[in-house]
Amino acid sequence: HVLDTVRRLAMAHPEIAFSLRDGERQVLKLSHAQGDMIDARLDRLDAIMGNNFAANAIPIETDRDGLFLSGFAGLPTLNRGNASHQYLFVNGRPVRDKLLYGAVRGAYRDFLAHDRHALIALFLDVPPEAVDINVHPAKTEVRFRDSGLVRGLIVSALKHALAAAGHRAS
């Protein structure tokens, strides 16, 4: 649980170095990024997610009605049997939100078998008044004022990026 939390924080902040030890064993060591933050974020995601993520990911960057979505989505050929490599952030905060995970699943529905999951890291920035982060004590769940807008933004951005990368729905 601690390792997962540190990984999520490290993804959100590539400009910060992270190190985690378990006794004498180095569990995680990530240097701080320099230069372009888009490249830095992709390098950080690749270091954490493995599976040659950077070589098999497409950039996501779009906005709609005050919402801004960025990040990287794995190509359909890069997938897993569980959703453990799906990372979602709202205003820089790691979240585990059913609406967001459902939007990702919906976007990949025509590209992946039902039991497969995309590797993804998405960063959604919304105006503070458009989201309630006090739904859960750990603040890992959120409630959006316009959940349809959020879902539509994610689904359309992912489908558009996958199509632009040459992937067509089956």
Regions found by a protein language model. Name each.
Residues 1-170:
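N-terminal phosphate-binding caps/lids of nucleotide- and nucleic-acid-binding domains
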